[in-house]
Amino acid sequence: MDEVSLLIDLINNNWSSNATALVSSGDISASHAVVPEVIDIRTTAANKGVRVDLNQYPATIVVFEDSQNIEYPTVHYDVRHETYSFTLHIRVLHDERSGLDADYGKDRLRAIYLILRRVLESKRTGYTASDGSRFQQLFVGSRSESNDRAKRLFGYKVSLEAKRFALSIP
């Protein structure tokens, strides 16, 4: 499984339990504990990757792989460490369902961010997918806002670093 697919698998498989935990603790409202559409930006499928109709989903997370760095920590170069940098774009529309609630979009965005951060931090010491693909460490980095008030679109860009250690070289 490639790295972006592994990250999407991690998010999808751990979303519901972490959302439930945040609702139970009172950190987010149950109305904002929705399951987002997680999209690999490289996909060519219709309404995924290239153009996404945000009205179809309560929230969207678009995953980008920014870079990969390889280190050879031994004198013999027989193993390598890999570090991957990702950007996750969280997108939420402030729509008509909000009624008179002027903070609906901001509250939904905050809830999605808190769930995503909890998912990633809960697996900070590693995640293994069903096919054996694995990250040994995950680090949530910076967050920046990415809003478009004219389109009623709220968003965050979240950086993430994932590491794999001691991969043998054939």
Model-derived features with residue positions:
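General helical secondary-structure elements
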Residues: V38, T44-N47, T87, Y104, ...
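Extracellular/virion structural assembly segments
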Residues: Y77-T83, R91-E121
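Oligomerization/assembly interface segments of phage tail-like spikes and tubes
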Residues: D78-E96, K151-A166
